[in-house]
Amino acid sequence: DNRVGIVRDDQVLDVTAQADPGTCIPSLPVRLDLERCARRPLASVRLLSPVRAPGKIVAAPVNYRAHIEEMHKSNVSPGHNIPDIDRAGLFLKATSSLVGPAEGIAQRFLDRRTDYEVELVVVFGKSASEVSRDEALDYVAGYCVGLDITVRGTEDRSFRKSIDTYSVLGPWLTTADEIPDPDRLQLTLHQNGELRQNTNTSDLLFGVRR
């Protein structure tokens, strides 16, 4: 029922009654009276997207060095190779594609290859424009794990990545103060118990500060 909670160990503190949509995310635990919040076991709640309605979703294509090498070796590309991410630029995903980890993925275009990648998602807490790298992290509210789903084909990248449910975000938002260096995070993805992806954000071409 779209409630707001703060995760503490294996419990979720329900702060819906106190949460102000305009409140800066990183200061929520400080401003709220957590002692009088109702508590529920984390295992009993259904986790939706921790970001309800983002203004936009901006992504960088083929942003890991190892991924570029893999694509060249397997000759997998959306109709063309990406030799240089600086020339490829960033792209947008539809916000309507966003779901939480408990909502599931509705696969489309079953006659095509569909790929998936684990991603580090950076959530901005305030507007930013022409910010220096030294100040970049001051604008970050927190981080999430993302699952980016892609249908392979020759259409525009944004179209193939913007299908409903193809942007999974969660399991929750970790505030920026808990991650001092986002460029040293290990990301893994398992499918049915099998390790399918193992990478580190130190391998990013476009790092968080960039």
Describe the residue ranges of each PLM region.
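Residues embedded in well-ordered beta-strands
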Residues: 4, 119-123, 144, 188
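A generic local secondary-structure boundary/capping motif
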Residues: 47-49, 78-81, 105-114, 128-135, ...
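Flexible glycine-rich active-site/ligand-binding loops centered on an Asp-His dyad
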Residues: 78, 83-86, 90-93, 134-164, ...
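N-terminal non-catalytic cap/leader segment that marks the start of a structured domain
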Residues: 1-88, 180, 188
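Short loop segments at secondary-structure junctions
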Residues: 10-11, 95-96, 125-129, 149-150, ...
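Catalytic-pocket segment enriched in acidic/His residues
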Residues: 37-41, 46-50, 63, 67, ...
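Hydrophobic alpha-helical segments and helix pairs
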Residues: 79-128
